[in-house]
Every structure is written in structure tokens, then in C-alpha cells.
Design a protein with these regions (language model features):
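Hydrophobic alpha-helix feature that most strongly marks membrane-spanning transmembrane helices
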Residues: 35, 45-48, 66, 161-164, ...
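Alpha-helical recognition segments enriched in aromatics with Gly/Pro capping
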Residues: 1-49
Length: 239
């Protein structure tokens, strides 16, 4: 939707949080969502100019930005839906630091690193663990082994559950000989998951935005009908 009349209605009906809402296709909205001027210029150039109405997939704009950030953006780690991972064979009073690349893309020519603290208790994503894994699941399961990104190999040994059967903590043992690379016996590990130290991470407020409409072409829908809007599902607020 690019019509100013339609967009104004979204603002006036409080379906969005203003003209600079990151879900809006306005320049101020794109800027708040993280789009750079160069990515927008490149998208316009790639799309070309036409006298006829043309529908351009939003994924093309996303791809242009992704290609730029892949080379320019420094990486940081966030765990948005955490569950605790306890390394049982790691000393409770120990902390060591791993050097992780700020940009691992070889084409970025960025050799700088950052130090990331590693401790006995870590946060990982809930979706990176499954008691009953689906087919081809390559992350952490009971008895399986994964690589903690930039750190050790760990094998899951058990879980703690609350009175409702919900997993509240995962137990694992680390192969402390794998700090600098692959295991000496040459065994293959299928997956790598990201993590942060419970003691050293920072609290953050995160808003996750999705597309505003379920329809790819809103021009086919009457202006008075917003039954396809799903604004209430396109913003997730996490703390």
C-alpha cells in the first residue's frame, strides 16, 4: 500500500503508531526499521522506472538491505526467548572470554573481534532445544551434541522441569578440549547454537515487526475493507 489516503487511515485509526511506524512503507518508517539510504537507492535503481502500475515484492527490498548489512554490519548476539543451559562440568566461579569475529563474512575484510564471556550458566533460545525433536533437527536434544557458537562442544545430559512439566533448565557437559576447534577424535557435530552468559548479558527491550497485511496486493481489496489487516499480530514486544 503506497496510497497516502490509505496510509493516513491506518494512522488515524491507530492501526499503526504513526507515519514512522516501522511497518509503514514511508521513508521515516523504513529508516526506523533499519533501512539505509544506499539500500533504498539501490532498490529503486534495480526496480527501474515504468509508466504502468507495477507490483514489486517487498522481499526484493529486504534482499538488497540484507546484502549490504552482510558486509557492513557488526554482529552481536541476542537470546529473545531464553531457557537456561547449565554446564555441569564447568566451575561455578570461572569465567573465560572467547574472541568472536565482528563480521565473519570473508568478503567484509573485517578482522576485528570482540570478547564474549563464557560461564557455567548460559541462556540459549528455547527453540534450540527439543525433548522430542522433529525430523532433521540439528540443534540440542537429550543425548545429542552441538557447538556453542565460538566456544565448546556440549552434550545434553538432562533437564529440570516445573510442576507443569515445562522445561526450566537444561543440563549439559562440555568437551573442554574443543575450545580451539574440532574434537581430537574427529567426530562430527551437526549443529551450532548461539548463547549469552547469564552473569554478563544485558537486559534489552526488543520489538519484532512483521508485514502489516496478509495480502500481497492490497489494491485488489476495497478501500473500506480492512478485514485482511493483522496489525495486532505484526508487533511482538519482548523484554
Amino acid at each position: 500500500v503506497m496510497s497516502k489516503r490509505y496510509l493516513r487511515e491506518l494512522v488515524e485509526k491507530n492501526i499503526v503508531d504513526g507515519w514512522d511506524d516501522p511497518r509503514m512503507p514511508t521513508l521515516s518508517g523504513l529508516r526506523r526499521r533499519g533501512y539505509t539510504p544506499t539500500s533504498i537507492f539501490k532498490f529503486v535503481k534495480d526496480a527501474g522506472i515504468s509508466k504502468a502500475d507495477n507490483l514489486v515484492d517487498m522481499r526484493q527490498l529486504e534482499a538488497v538491505l540484507r546484502a549490504e548489512l552482510e558486509l557492513n554490519a557488526q554482529r552481536r548476539v541476542a537470546v529473545l526467548d531464553p531457557v537456561k543451559l547449565i554446564i555441569d562440568n564447568y566451575p561455578a566461579d570461572q569465567c573465560e572470554y572467547f574472541d568472536l569475529p565482528n563480521n565473519p563474512n570473508r568478503d567484509a575484510n573485517d578482522s576485528t573481534t570482540r570478547k564474549v564471556a563464557f560461564t557455567k550458566e548460559l541462556w540459549i533460545e528455547k527453540e534450540d532445544f527439543a525433548e522430542v525433536p522433529p525430523p532433521k533437527f540439528k540443534r540440542l536434544t537429550l543425548g545429542s551434541e552441538v557447538r556453542l557458537m565460538g566456544a565448546y562442544l556440549v552434550r545434553c545430559t538432562g533437564v529440570d522441569k516445573d510442576e507443569n512439566g515445562k522445561v526450566v533448565a537444561i543440563h549439559a557437559e562440555a568437551d573442554l578440549e574443543t575450545r580451539n576447534g574440532n574434537p581430537a577424535d574427529g567426530r562430527k557435530v551437526r549443529g551450532t547454537i548461539h548463547w549469552v552468559s547469564c552473569a554478563h548479558c544485558l537486559d534489552a527491550e526488543v520489538e519484532l515487526y512483521d508485514k502489516l497485511f496478509t495480502e500481497s496486493n492490497m489494491n485488489s481489496i476495497p478501500a473500506v475493507s480492512y478485514t485482511h489487516l493483522r496489525a495486532h499480530e505484526t508487533l511482538r514486544h519482548l523484554v
